[in-house]
Structures are given as structure tokens and as C-alpha cells.
């Protein structure tokens, strides 16, 4: 798999099935997106997970949690559209081991995919930042933004790995496109048509701050009018 070092979603990713194909794909990809990395291809049938960790200046884990990417767009692999908090301590420890080896400090986001050939969760990438989906763990009880603020202010952040399970976070715009493009639209669990629940939250909307949602949808509608931005969002 050929992947740009700087990108988002699945933009720029391509798959080479031979050394010759890799040599053919690399120059135009690098020319368009900049430096790239080459990774082993893992069949996308395996579940994808995110391990979110906060490490102090001594690379000790203060907060750690995991959520599963139940749906994502494009359906063959990309940014998540529905996430669910789960308990996978071995994935937290695997991410922590990698970050400690790097002397990590602050927020670390580790992406994993379970290889269906051997059942092992394997690292895809590490992001040194908050991800768009961090809210699912915040709603589950791990307030990463606040604890990172405390760490930056020289305070001692709370240390815990306790959080609520089966909390869902949905990104509705991309989930709508997923529904249009996925063959599993009527087989997915939980159902695509479940829009309300005490355990269900939205990335782009909150009753506690509704105007941000209004602003988001207004900008999204403007993007749909622009042909270039529309193609980028609906790639």
C-alpha cells in the first residue's frame, strides 16, 4: 500500500500488487502529495480500532481508551463515520509501548486494523494530535482535551483507564454517503436508521452547543455548490 505522509481520509492511497506497479505508482503520487510511505497491505475485512493515549513528560500513560470503527467512508477504507467504545486493553498497551519507545509526550492517536489472516491487531499509523472522533471517549468519561490542558499548565493530569462502553459517535454527512455507496447499507449493526439514543452522539452537532452544528451544515451546503469542493467531499 502506498500512502502519502500528509493527507486525510483515503486521499492519495493506492495499492500495488507487484514491485513494477509500485515503481509506476510512486512518482505521480509523490509529485501530487509529497513524501510517501510504503506499508504492507492488510485486507480491510478486519475491524479497525483507534487507541487514544495521553502521556506525561516521562512517557507514562495517564489516559487510555479504545473505540472501534464500525463504518467508514470510502467503504473500502477511510475516515470513520460511526464509532463505538470498546474494551481492548491489549491494543492500549500495544499503542503505549510504541509511544514510549518514541519518548512520546502529549496526545497520541494510534490506528490499528485486525489482520483477518491471523487475528492480530496491527499498527497502521500514529497521529500526534486530537482526531475528529475524540468526542466518543470524552462522552465515555475520558476528557482528553481538559487533561492535556492540565498537563500543559504544569498540573498532574488524572490517571485512569475507566470509561463507559458501547458509546456511539456518528459523523452524519459521511455516513449518509456511506449508505449510498455501501453494499451493507441494510445489514449494518447498529442500524443506519437509528438516529436517536442516550448512548448516541454526533460529531457535528450537540444540544449543548447547537450553533456550531448550524455553522457546520451551512459551510457544508456552500461546499456542495462549489464543483471542486463537492468532488473532494464525495470522492
PLM feature segments, named:
Residues 17-77, 83-96, 113-122:
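Phosphate-binding site of ATP-dependent enzymes
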Residues 1-15:
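Conserved anion/nucleotide-ligand pocket segment
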Residues 7, 42-47, 103-106:
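A short catalytic or substrate-binding loop motif that flags glycine-/basic-rich loops and adjacent residues
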Residues 101-135:
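Conserved metal-phosphate-binding beta-hairpin within the catalytic cores
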Residues 150-235:
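Peripheral (often C-terminal) accessory segments that flank ATP-dependent C-N-forming ligase machineries
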Residues 10, 70-74, 79-80, 127-141:
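Glycine-rich phosphate/pyrophosphate-binding beta-alpha loops
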Residues 143-151:
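C-terminal helical cap and adjacent loop that interface with cofactors, partners, or active-site loops
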Amino acid at each position: 500500500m502506498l500512502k502519502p505522509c500528509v493527507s486525510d481520509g483515503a486521499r492519495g492511497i493506492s495499492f500495488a500488487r507487484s514491485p513494477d506497479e509500485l515503481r509506476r505508482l510512486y512518482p505521480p503520487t509523490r509529485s501530487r502529495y509529497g513524501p510517501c510511505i510504503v506499508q504492507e497491505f492488510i485486507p480491510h475485512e478486519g475491524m479497525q480500532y483507534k487507541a487514544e493515549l495521553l502521556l506525561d513528560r516521562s512517557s507514562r500513560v495517564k489516559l487510555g481508551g479504545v473505540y472501534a470503527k464500525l463504518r467508514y467512508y470510502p467503504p473500502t477504507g477511510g475516515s470513520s463515520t460511526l464509532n463505538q467504545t470498546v474494551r481492548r486493553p491489549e491494543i492500549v498497551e500495544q499503542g503505549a509501548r510504541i509511544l514510549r519507545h518514541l519518548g512520546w509526550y502529549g496526545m497520541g492517536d494510534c490506528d490499528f486494523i485486525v489482520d483477518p489472516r491471523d487475528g492480530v491487531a496491527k499498527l497502521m499509523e500514529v497521529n500526534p494530535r486530537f482526531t475528529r472522533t475524540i468526542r466518543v471517549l470524552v462522552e465515555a468519561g475520558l476528557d482528553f482535551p481538559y487533561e492535556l490542558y492540565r498537563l500543559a499548565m504544569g498540573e498532574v493530569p488524572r490517571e485512569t483507564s475507566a470509561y463507559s462502553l458501547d458509546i456511539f459517535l456518528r459523523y452524519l454527512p459521511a455516513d449518509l454517503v456511506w449508505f449510498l455507496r455501501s453494499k451493507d447499507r441494510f445489514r449494518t449493526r447498529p442500524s443506519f436508521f437509528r438516529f436517536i439514543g442516550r448512548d448516541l452522539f454526533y460529531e457535528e452537532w450537540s444540544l449543548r452547543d447547537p450553533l456550531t452544528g448550524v455553522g457546520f451544515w451551512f459551510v457544508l451546503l456552500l461546499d456542495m455548490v462549489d464543483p471542486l469542493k463537492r468532488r473532494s467531499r464525495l470522492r
